[in-house]
């Protein structure tokens, strides 16, 4: 990602495929590689989706919550260190809670994809305007 020439924006939406431990251990290092290569490029951090079925599965809810807390902790640490042009997108309200946003409780339907875009696009637009 850091080798991309003239990027306009980085969107870090890795939380669904990472563990809280991995975010804590290598999240900042990953960010620094990108930031060192492109110090002026905005970076958007996105939380993992809280899927509606998690009200029935405390184990998954706990795992997703831990990962999102780790992501937020990383973001706050970067902000506190003086990082500029970083943005954060919370999971709350991302895809709705009616169960219609996924085909299998994980993968988005067209409606889920639309809701996701509607949720993240305003932050991406703001990041690009400020760049």
Task: Give the positions of each predicted feature.
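A short helix->loop->beta-strand "cap" motif at the edges of active sites that frequently abuts
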Residues: 38-43
